[in-house]
Amino acid sequence: MTKHARFFLLPSFILISAALIAGCNDKGEEKAHVGEPQVTVHIVKTAPLEVKTELPGRTNAYRIAEVRPQVSGIVLNRNFTEGSDVQAGQSLYQIDPATYQANYDSAKGELAKSEAAAAIAHLTVKRYVPLVGTKYISQQEYDQAIADARQADAAVIAAKATVESARINLAYTKVTAPISGRIGKSTVTEGALVTNGQTTELATVQQLDPIYVDVTQSSNDFMRLKQSVEQGNLHKENATSNVELVMENGQTYPLKGTLQFSDVTVDESTGSITLRAVFPNPQHTLLPGMFVRARIDEGVQPDAILIPQQGVSRTPRGDATVLIVNDKSQVEARPVVASQAIGDKWLISEGLKSGDQVIVSGLQKARPGEQVKATTDTPADTASK
């Protein structure tokens, strides 16, 4: 080989070697890029949110009245249909009034006697007035006549009270509905002996329109919501909260109710308090004892944060955590407070801010401290709002 040929081959060899080295470096960088786990992130944004709390509960009658006899006797008639609607004052049972009618008539007779005796006593006093101080009537006799007249007046008052008592007992033989509502089954039939003060009710009347819904809420949640309102994190337009109702069959009750009050004590065994709502029930769709779920309007949270539920995991202690992608495309674990599930999302009250990137897919490939390649689950313009 000539000297010129050797000089020609040397630069070519150098160029080829450089090209091979550059190619290897490019493949290494490509492999490094390809090796980054790919994850999907949800970009956190804040927005006003109507906060509703869904709680289990049961329906209760607005008013309940147990019908009991106030006098003793034999039931002659039952004057209602079981399961029907009755009006206050409507006759339900008729107890044999014979004895009570006789007592009433006797009391009226005694009253007449007392009134007659009182009339004579007062007439005697009038006759004695011009004779007082003469030899015909002494002062003592006059004083005695006045005392007799007063005793006669007292006897009239007592007789009138006896008549009124007898009249009331006679009226009690007609057992009436104390309230308007729906009456249940009767525990007695015609011919049964009932007694004044018996422990067993004759029937029960329940007012169903409106109707109560009693729900329970943990004392912790109750205090948290109360503090949110006091601190301004939760805005309420008025003191009354609207309530929606979901019935046992999953259907939403068409009429809305209002929250009336919360109990003043906490149940020591369950750590919960009772909330009571009232609902209109004109068609008697709701019956006492039904299991329902009440959705209570707690107010509006102006800067609420919602993230998909799959982005939240729990530690063995039950604490909520999320994985986020920071500005360096590195994964970070962050503790959060997931206060409430709303649909398929968690309401986050602490731990996140607007603009954070929460990993919602590819969690099994993401490790804290590692770099990842992130794609968003929402358009950029939506996430930036």
From Swiss-Prot:
One GO term of the biological process aspect: response to xenobiotic stimulus
Protein's name in the database: Multidrug export protein AcrE
Membrane topology: Lipid-anchor
N-palmitoyl cysteine: lipidated positions: 24
GO molecular function: transmembrane transporter activity
Disulfide bonds: none
Signal sequence, start to end: 1-23
Localization per record: Cell inner membrane
PROSITE patterns tied to this protein: PROKAR_LIPOPROTEIN
Function: Part of the tripartite efflux system AcrEF-TolC. Involved in the efflux of indole and organic solvents.
NCBIfam families (UniProt xref): RND_mfp
Self-association state and partner proteins as the record states: Part of the tripartite efflux system AcrEF-TolC, which is composed of an inner membrane transporter, AcrF, a periplasmic membrane fusion protein, AcrE, and an outer membrane component, TolC. The complex forms a large protein conduit and can translocate molecules across both the inner and outer membranes.
Classification of source organism: Bacteria, Pseudomonadati, Pseudomonadota, Gammaproteobacteria, Enterobacterales
Pfam families: CusB_dom_1 (PF00529), HlyD_D23 (PF16576)
Residue ranges of the region described as Disordered: 366-385
Biased composition (Polar residues): 373-385
Principal location class: membrane
Residues with lipid group (S-diacylglycerol cysteine): 24
Induction: Induced by LeuO, part of the acrEF operon.
Family per similarity comment: Belongs to the membrane fusion protein (MFP) (TC 8.A.1) family.
Cellular component, GO, one term: periplasmic side of plasma membrane
Keywords of this entry: Cell inner membrane, Cell membrane, Lipoprotein, Membrane, Palmitate, Signal, Transport
